[in-house]
Amino acid sequence: MIGHNNFIIQSVILRFFMFQSVEGLLTPGLIKQQKEQLKQTELENFAQADVNSLISHRTLFCDNFLIRLWRQFSLHEVTDLALIAVGGYGRREIFPLSDLDFLILTEQPMPADLAKKVEEFIQFVWDCGFDVGASVRTLEDCDSQGRADITIATNLLESRLLTGNETLFDKLSSIVGREDFWPRKTFFEAKIQEKKQRYQRYNNTSYNLEPDIKYNPGGLRDLHLIYWIALRHSNALSLEEILQSGFIYPEEYAELERNQQFLFKVRFALHLILKRYDNRLLFDRQVKVSELLGYQGEGNQGVETMMKAFFQSLQAISLASDILAKHYKEHFVDENGEEECQVLDDNFQMINNAIFLVREDCFVQQPDTILDLFSYLIIRPQAELHSSTLRLLHLALGQLNGYLSELPAAREKFLRLLTQPRGIERALIPMHKYGVLTAYIPEWKGIEGLMQFDLFHIYTVDEHTMRVLAKLETFLSEETAEAHPLCVKLFPSLPDRALIYIAALFHDIAKGRGGNHADLGAVDVGRFAAQHGFDCREIETMKWLVKQHLFMSVTAQRRDIHDPEVVMNFAAEVQNQVRLNYLVCLTVADICATNTTLWNSWKRSLFASLYQYTNQQFNQGMDNLLDNQEQEEQNKALALEILQSQGFTEDVQSLWKRCPGDYFLRNTPKELAWHAVLLAGVETELLVKISNRFSAGGTEVFIYCKDRPNLFLKVVAAIGNKKLSIHDAQIITSLDGYAFDSFIVTELDGSLLKFDRRRVLEKAIINSLNSNELTKLQGSENHKLQHFNVKTEVRFLNTEKTTHTEMELFTLDKAGLLADVSLVFSELNLSIQNAKITTIGEKAQDFFILTNAKGEALSERERQSLSEKLQARLD
């Protein structure tokens, strides 16, 4: 099949791309037509085609086009000119949207008429629809500019003569081949610095969910780094030549070749579906590319399977690039001074600052010694791994007959790593990077490179898991106390940190299998813990942590934590203080490692409040619900202290007598004091104030007015029209019918509102509330969201309360969502008593406390009607 397909492509080349069938002059229209025919042929035969052939044919097309055009402009008659492919074009890597990089080389500066003709030649190439990277230089220019700029130097190193003066090209080759043009050490260090800067732009991880095929860590640029180092050192021009030079092992060559082919195929497919040059695999493109590559499955299965293979390729290339660069540095760059050698044990030595494996067969003959390697990394904080050690480790992992965890000695060493200071940073994270976790934990391979096709999880499952572990370890440092005071207080005193580390390792390990990943992961961690000799109580703790790792997050963010019944139910599941301490640390680390924008002081206070209430419930006992009266009085007293410190002398009791008990629970003492100052002697029926001082995780909007129909709808529409995100809504009605409502809002990027934006929003809300008409929402959809299919789901929580109904709404987040929801509530004469607004990537997961027109809980018929109307409106 492949041979037949390549024959088709070759036939097209003979007819079109050699330009033998084209009579007369080339025109931009003709070239564009032939480019389109080539693209169509590639699309029709892409699934079965060999990507190397596709790239070669593209390169050949460009070669013959430029050579013929060179003659058409009579530039072949000029003896002092050479047309040279450089950069990616020079190494024959042309994809459908690649830049066409070429150099027009001359020995001496051109006369004006020739310069004009060359300029017209370059413009013609642009007119044909190519993105052109053209330069016109003399030999002297190439020498001086190449020495000054590493990018120019690298391009020149990859030069390939297309047509023109061969002697001139040879002179260029001599210039760039001189040792003093870019000395090997200087060239290597410059390229490594480029790589470091590139990695920093991508958070030092291969696992960005909308990756750049070229520049992402592990992308094509990491392959190019290997090429460039080998090219500067030995003039090797391809992986095959690098293999022949002895720079890489046959096993390394096979792995690099396989992963290069995969990235080439993905990039070629991406270029076929785009109109403009780009190498980013954005979500919408991932779907199309996976289809073009033939990936199939229900829902997102096809795209997730492709992206898993993609991320595994990135990780393999990144690792190979690191190892080979380290190998080159150790052997060819570092000064040839005396090596400092220190014996660590029979198997390991320290050579300078690198851990060196003495016996090459050690890892194969005694696999448990692999764990010793990481123990030495902990003991010696400044040490790194020698390139030969890494290469032997990589080869040994491929020869294991079973999992390392099957070896008693390895299990003992693994558990010891978890108890060491910086054991996560210096052992577990490197073990993941170098493939040892995959060799240790049977289930780990299933999540390696596994992405979730959504906007919420910005890392793959394995990368997220390592970030959870890393975050947990930071709770041992006082430097983390400002952002995580509760966790820094609790984590050092946990009975056994190994339990939470292992629970973190397994909390998402069953993702991608179908079914409830928390339940399946609990089974996995139970088996692993039993294998490692933990007792029944410890095993049950780990199983519970994995099974319930989302429980605190859901309760804090999607339940009314000021409701004593909610606190009682949460405490009943947690059971005791030790579990609570474990759970809060795991939950916070999980949130922080999921998405860097999720954690803020508002959420910190939310989780701290739930922790505090649960503590109170444990201390009081589980026989009775919490009485919130004590907390209400404490908040009042603290608010009075704040007011007195500010010199506030007005009587607040008359104001507070109007407010229900919930008002003093749901607002902090600072907010209570702020409201008292705002409302002192207020005569207006409507007050809107916005401040950044009371919720560091967002901007607080406080609204005081006589309660009125559609109040919530008008407010959220006004906020939505200003392109803001709503994170929390607190609806409180005073005993005399006034709204004391608060909203937490941010800009779309999560930042606080600046002064001008706050004033504009105040006016917009006042105008909306004073208007007799409902505010029309103006806005544009987030185009990223259209690629996600989220069906609306309405859930009513099972409570025995007759005073209100609690409802959860799951739907696609979109512009004006809350306004649409509020409109449905309004149509059914429902009142919102409270709301929690949570956006999880592309999904809205909102919680509402509602009453009907009678001020009671919704009947079954009212629930059914509400559910149907919401689904009809939102889907």
From Swiss-Prot:
GO terms for molecular function: [protein-PII] uridylyltransferase activity; phosphoric diester hydrolase activity. It catalyses: [protein-PII]-L-tyrosine + UTP = [protein-PII]-uridylyl-L-tyrosine + diphosphate; [protein-PII]-uridylyl-L-tyrosine + H2O = [protein-PII]-L-tyrosine + UMP + H(+). Residues 344-699 are annotated as: Uridylyl-removing. Its cofactor is Mg(2+). SUPFAM superfamilies: ACT-like, HD-domain/PDEase-like, Nucleotidyltransferase, Nucleotidyltransferase substrate binding subunit/domain. Residues 1-343 are annotated as: Uridylyltransferase. Uridylyltransferase (UTase) activity is inhibited by glutamine, while glutamine activates uridylyl-removing (UR) activity. GO terms for biological process: nitrogen fixation; regulation of nitrogen utilization. Residues 700-782, 806-875 form the ACT domain. Its EC number is 2.7.7.59, 3.1.4.-. Keywords: Hydrolase, Magnesium, Multifunctional enzyme, Nitrogen fixation, Nucleotidyltransferase, Repeat, Transferase. Coiled coil: none annotated. CDD domains: ACT_ACR-UUR-like_2, ACT_UUR-like_1, HDc, NT_GlnE_GlnD_like. Residues 461-583 form the HD domain. PROSITE patterns: ACT, HD. InterPro entries: ACT-like_dom_sf, ACT_dom, HD/PDEase_dom, HD_domain, NT_sf, PII_UdlTrfase/GS_AdlTrfase, UTase/UR. Belongs to the GlnD family. Modifies, by uridylylation and deuridylylation, the PII regulatory proteins (GlnB and homologs), in response to the nitrogen status of the cell that GlnD senses through the glutamine level. Under low glutamine levels, catalyzes the conversion of the PII proteins and UTP to PII-UMP and PPi, while under higher glutamine levels, GlnD hydrolyzes PII-UMP to PII and UMP (deuridylylation). Thus, controls uridylylation state and activity of the PII proteins, and plays an important role in the regulation of nitrogen fixation and metabolism. Has four distinct domains: an N-terminal nucleotidyltransferase (NT) domain responsible for UTase activity, a central HD domain that encodes UR activity, and two C-terminal ACT domains that seem to have a role in glutamine sensing. This is Bifunctional uridylyltransferase/uridylyl-removing enzyme. It comes from Mannheimia succiniciproducens (strain KCTC 0769BP / MBEL55E). The lineage of its organism: Bacteria, Pseudomonadati, Pseudomonadota, Gammaproteobacteria, Pasteurellales. The gene is glnD.
